[in-house]
Curated annotation (Swiss-Prot):
HAMAP family: HOA (MF_01656). It comes from Azoarcus sp. (strain BH72). Mn(2+) binds at D20, H202, H204. The gene is lapG. This is 4-hydroxy-2-oxovalerate aldolase 1. It comes from the Bacteria. InterPro entries: 2-IPM_HCS-like, 4OH_2_O-val_aldolase, Aldolase_TIM, DmpG_comm, DRE_TIM_HOA, PYR_CT. CDD domains: DRE_TIM_HOA. The lineage of its organism: Bacteria, Pseudomonadati, Pseudomonadota, Betaproteobacteria, Rhodocyclales.
Length: 347
């Protein structure tokens, strides 16, 4: 992956720290903090930034936690301050509704990731079609993409495209993939999608591979890359966007962002907001090693405290069971069963 074969390639960066970062903050980011971060990202030239509850539209719930404000309040506050960046949202069919997407659009959102499990694209046609009807930049987002092979991802991506998705994402929700895994899936998509349909990659840094995987995605044909300034996100965080931007600049990949401003946002704005340093630790490394949905990290830690079973053991078991997003309630059940089998008394 030398400068020569990627020099001049144009890539669109999409920041996730105000949506995926909500997971790391237990959904506790204030409207004022949202605006402060978003305006700084806008000034640094980030073209897209995602603003919602960590679980997206409809995410405020007992299962996923309650944020400090509604999605509409967050979106409206941020969108009204943007000079060039577009605000995006996450929508998981079955959790978020078309009514909530309309409300997000009315508040100022202009882009949407319509997210399904990597084998369930057929749950998204109505939501994708509605997003297109609204005139939104519309992405089909295939979560936990490591659980489907390249041919399967291509098939699911073609479905997303047929519903109206303008971009299809390979989404490494568990931070499990290695560069060869990403390359195979992106190439398979590029072979079947129409030339005008873009391909994106969303990585997590649980194995420390976020940047390498994103570069592999670009080399295979991706033109959109998700990341998070200072890596603020679920698990060990998303691909750290300021580091990725620096690598792109070294390689001659054109992102259109101001690297030094992005570095300053990470150091001066995001890091002071962190409740804990988002890094590859024992548990987040286990997420990547075992292929577990990154959002499960804090849920597993809470279950470990309650039932006296190490979080790492719980995560390995969740990986063995191939648990996916939306099954958060099963984490407590799994930990309780493991504690019973081990004869451990709950706290």
């Amino acid at each position: 992956m030398s400068e020569s074969n990627l020099k001049g390639r144009k890539v669109v960066l999409h920041d996730m720290c105000l949506r995926d970062g909500m997971h790391a903050k237990r959904e506790q980011i204030s409207v004022e903090q949202m605006v402060k971060v978003a305006t700084a990202l806008d000034d640094a030239g980030i073209p897209y930034l995602q603003v919602t509850h960590g679980a997206g539209l409809g995410g405020n719930s007992l299962q996923h936690g309650f944020a400090l404000a509604s999605n509409e309040e967050y979106i409206a506050a941020v969108a009204s301050r943007m000079k060039q960046a577009k605000v995006s949202v996450l929508l998981i069919p079955g959790l978020g509704t078309m009514r909530e997407l309309q409300a997000a659009y009315d508040a100022g959102a202009r882009s949407v990731h319509v997210a399904t499990h990597c084998t369930e694209a057929d749950t998204a046609p109505q939501h994708i079609a509605f997003a297109r009807k609204l005139g939104m930049d519309t992405t089909g987002f295939l979560m936990m993409s490591h659980l489907n092979d390249a041919a399967g991802i291509a098939q699911q991506g073609k479905l997303m495209e047929s519903y109206g998705a303008q971009t299809v994402y390979v989404t490494d929700s568990a931070g499990y993939m290695l560069p060869a895994d990403v390359t195979a899936r992106v190439r398979a998509l590029r072979e079947v999608l129409n030339p005008e349909t873009e391909i994106g990659f969303h990585g997590h840094h649980n194995l420390g591979m976020g940047i390498a995987n994103s570069i592999a995605a670009i080399e295979a044909g991706a033109t959109r890359i998700d990341g998070s300034v200072a890596g603020l996100g679920a698990g060990a965080g998303n691909t750290p966007l300021e580091v990725f931007a620096a690598v792109c600049e070294r390689m001659g990949i054109e992102t259109g962002v101001d690297l030094f401003k992005l570095m300053d946002v990470a150091e001066d704005v995001i890091v002071p907001m962190m409740d804990h340093m988002v890094r590859v630790d024992r548990e987040s490394l286990t997420l990547g090693f075992a292929g577990v949905y990154s959002t499960f990290l804090l849920h597993a830690k809470r279950a470990a405290e309650r039932f006296g079973v190490p979080a790492r053991d719980i995560l390995v078991e969740l990986g063995r069971k191939k648990m996916i997003g939306g099954q958060e309630d099963m984490i407590q059940d799994t930990a309780m069963t493991m504690a019973r089998e081990r004869g451990v008394s709950a706290a």
